[in-house]
């Protein structure tokens, strides 16, 4: 089983944690942006089937 030889420094831990948090923040902001563009109908890369509220006659 692999065991680290030396203790990881606090600053390195903070750097790695910030990278991990930044990835999550970017994914969340991208998802929010896509949701906004879909809800306004300005999305060019995501197709949503439009349903009409009118009853068929």
UniProtKB/Swiss-Prot annotation:
Cell compartment(s), UniProt: Plastid, Chloroplast
Which Pfam families does this one have? Ribosomal_L32p
What GO terms are given for molecular function?
A: structural constituent of ribosome
Write out the entry's keywords from A to Z: Chloroplast, Plastid, Ribonucleoprotein, Ribosomal protein
The primary location reported for this protein is: plastid
InterPro entries assigned: Ribosomal_bL32, Ribosomal_bL32_plant/cyanobact, Ribosomal_zn-bd
What does the entry give for GO biological process? translation
GO CC annotation terms, alphabetical: chloroplast; large ribosomal subunit
What protein family does this chain belong to? Belongs to the bacterial ribosomal protein bL32 family.
Q: What is this protein called?
A: Large ribosomal subunit protein bL32c
Native source organism of the sequence: Calycanthus floridus var. glaucus
What taxonomic lineage is listed for the species of origin? Eukaryota, Viridiplantae, Streptophyta, Embryophyta, Tracheophyta
């Amino acid at each position: 089983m692999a065991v680290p030889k030396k203790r990881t420094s606090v600053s390195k831990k903070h750097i790695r944690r910030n990278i991990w948090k930044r990835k999550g923040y970017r994914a969340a902001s991208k998802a929010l942006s896509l949701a906004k563009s879909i809800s306004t109908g300005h999305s060019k890369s995501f197709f949503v089937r439009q349903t009409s509220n009118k009853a068929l006659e």
